[in-house]
Amino acid sequence: MANLKSARHRKAAYDSSLQLANALGAGANKIKKQIRNVERLLAKKRDTLPDTVIVEKERTLEALRLELASAEKRALARKNAKKYHMVRFFERKKATRRYKQALKKVETSAGDDAALTDLRQRELELCYVVNFPKTTKYIALYPVEEDPEAAKETAAKRDAFLKVVAKQLSEGTLPVPLEQILKGKKLNKESTGISVSDSEDEEEPGRNEEAHEEEEDDFFE
């Protein structure tokens, strides 16, 4: 009997490991299906399953939910990378041009404080454009004219992100450091940009997709 229980536990552990292996890097729909399967199993057979199997399945369920959150975040990052590609491309060119102009002023001004301050600001702007998180709506540094009330809200969000970028720039923790940006580097496909926990403005993956779509053409908020 003990051997039978041990065999069941090993099989449950193997099945759980296999489920997790299949979920790693998978799309959200596939992971959701696996979550439903585990939930259905626990709902129907909890009274008859050994405690060890129940614990194993509950751990699997928790891990699958974490992987689902990661999958939804990756999908949102891919969507936003495509959606805001052109605006970020043009803003990077503009930020690079302004940085070079500021650098030239520093080199020709014999250490003028105002020129140095301007250069630091241009460095910050360049890092902002390149490292802005893919998991949230891009907020342009150089926006076109907009409604005054909307402009106030947008400016507040922009300032919040700039503070995060400035902090990570000073700490040397930016996903793409300034020296790499100046060499033409940008965020790779796996990176989602700066951590936005400090700005409290990250989109919740999978939430209100229709509202997100309504903003599809609003590149220059």
Swiss-Prot record:
Parts forming coiled coils: 28-81
InterPro entries documented for this protein: Efg1 (IPR019310), EFG1_rRNA-proc (IPR050786)
Superkingdom per UniProt: Eukaryota
Alphabetic keyword roster: Coiled coil, Nucleus, rRNA processing
Bias-annotated ranges (Acidic residues): 211-221
One of the record's GO cellular component terms: nucleolus
UniProt entry tagged with the keyword rRNA processing: yes
Function: Involved in rRNA processing.
Keyword Transit peptide tagged: no
Region (Disordered): 189-221
GO terms classed as biological process: maturation of SSU-rRNA from tricistronic rRNA transcript (SSU-rRNA, 5.8S rRNA, LSU-rRNA); nuclear RNA surveillance; re-entry into mitotic cell cycle after pheromone arrest
Protein localization: Nucleus, Nucleolus
Protein name: rRNA-processing protein EFG1
Family: Belongs to the EFG1 family.
Name of the encoding gene: EFG1
